[in-house]
């Protein structure tokens, strides 16, 4: 009984096709949007608490939100970005602030 086997060699097309189909997961930016009611110190607190920024970096991002209308807080995989948006939104509502946090594809 003889069986025919097709051997995969390093230069075969099959191996190359398998490798080219693998892609890294998409990344998403978590963005804070400016409003006229949320205090600046609360925005800094959010950036330190949920995004682990130090005071200087949090202040820079807060000022960018204030003057440019929005700023990126961090870039994450989809699941982590969704979690960050939900955490910030819930924390803002608990403290009665209308801070808007969104995510967009990087």
Swiss-Prot record:
Origin superkingdom: Bacteria
GO BP, sorted A to Z: protein catabolic process; proteolysis
Cystines in this chain: none
InterPro entries found in the cross-reference section: ClpS (IPR022935), ClpS_core (IPR003769), Ribosomal_bL12_C/ClpS-like (IPR014719)
Range of residues in the leader sequence: none
Family membership: Belongs to the ClpS family.
Quaternary structure (record): Binds to the N-terminal domain of the chaperone ClpA.
Role: Involved in the modulation of the specificity of the ClpAP-mediated ATP-dependent protein degradation.
The name this protein goes by in its record: ATP-dependent Clp protease adapter protein ClpS
Organism: Vibrio vulnificus (strain YJ016)
Recorded name of the encoding gene: clpS
């Amino acid at each position: 009984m003889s069986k025919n086997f097709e051997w995969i060699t390093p230069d075969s097309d099959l191996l190359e096709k398998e490798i080219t189909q693998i892609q890294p997961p998409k990344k998403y930016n978590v963005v804070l949007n400016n409003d006229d009611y949320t205090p600046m110190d609360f925005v800094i607190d959010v950036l330190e608490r949920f995004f682990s920024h130090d005071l200087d970096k949090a202040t820079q991002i807060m000022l960018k939100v204030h003057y440019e209308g929005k700023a990126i807080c961090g870039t994450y995989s989809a699941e982590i970005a969704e979690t960050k948006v939900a955490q910030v939104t819930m924390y803002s509502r608990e403290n009665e602030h209308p801070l808007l946090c969104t995510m967009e594809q990087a």
